[in-house]
Design a protein with these regions (language model features):
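Conserved N-terminal entry element of GNAT/NAT acetyltransferase domains
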Residues: 1-10, 30, 186
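Conserved acyl-donor/pantetheine-binding loop and adjacent beta-alpha core of acyl/acetyltransferases
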Residues: 76-111, 115
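Conserved beta-strand in the GNAT
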Residues: 61, 67-76, 112, 117
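Active-site rim helix/loop that mediates acceptor-substrate recognition in acyltransferases
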Residues: 36-59, 63-64
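Conserved catalytic-core motifs of GNAT/GCN5-like acyltransferases
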Residues: 77-79, 147-150, 162, 167-181
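Conserved GNAT-fold acetyl-CoA-binding loop/helix
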Residues: 24-47, 92-95
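Conserved GNAT acetyl-CoA-binding A-motif
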Residues: 109-111, 123, 139-151
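Conserved acetyl-CoA-binding loop-helix of GNAT-fold acetyltransferases
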Residues: 118, 124-137, 159-163
Length: 186
């Protein structure tokens, strides 16, 4: 059975691992390199802090039989700049990504779905769709349009987002590559 619960700072390691997995870091490809371990450790600390992009306060966990199996990180896009300023200076792994000159991923009026990831053993079972629908519901409750970025070279993710009703709104350069910006307006 799938249930959801708000994350807590005690979930920081799970959050960090799955944020990095969403960014295609291969966090389930063992053995982990020193770079991946360092990024995981640094991001874990960021996830414990309030008012960061990946803070536990912005995260929802999907549980399967009571165990964490998936992650959603989403927040009011009007706070993106504040959260970004509190996040990237703490992460050496992003030092070469020009985050200071990167355009904002989100803005006022958006409920930004920053990260969505499912542990490998739970993929293909509808958990990602359940998390995405939870995010869309939260956006509606907040009276904001739901937005996200997706790697255009990720056809399964593009199909999932399209099937839920997300529409392509253009492209955005972030973290050294182009992403598609998708949204649902209510």
């Amino acid at each position: 059975m799938i249930t959801f619960r708000p994350a807590t700072p005690d979930d920081a390691s799970f959050i960090a691992r799955h944020v990095l997995e969403a960014l295609h870091w291969g966090m389930y490809e063992l053995p982990l390199t020193e770079e991946k371990v360092r990024a995981w450790e640094e991001l874990t600390e960021v996830c414990r802090l309030p008012e960061t992009l990946y803070s536990a306060e912005n995260a929802t966990l999907a549980l399967v039989d009571g165990e964490p199996a998936g992650l959603l990180v989403a927040y009011d896009g009007g706070r993106y700049r504040e959260f970004r300023a509190n996040t990237f200076p703490r992460l050496s792994a992003f030092a070469d990504k020009d985050v200071d000159i990167m355009p904002d991923e989100s803005q006022e009026g958006e409920y930004y779905i920053d990260s969505l990831a499912v542990a490998p053993q739970h993929r293909g079972k509808g958990l990602g769709r359940s998390l995405l629908l939870e995010a869309v519901k939260q956006a509606q409750i907040a009276g904001l349009r739901a937005t996200l970025l997706v790697d255009p070279d990720n056809p399964p993710a593009l199909r999932l987002y399209s099937s839920v009703g997300f529409k392509d709104e253009g492209q955005l350069w972030a973290f050294g590559q182009w992403y598609r910006k998708l949204e649902i307006r209510f």
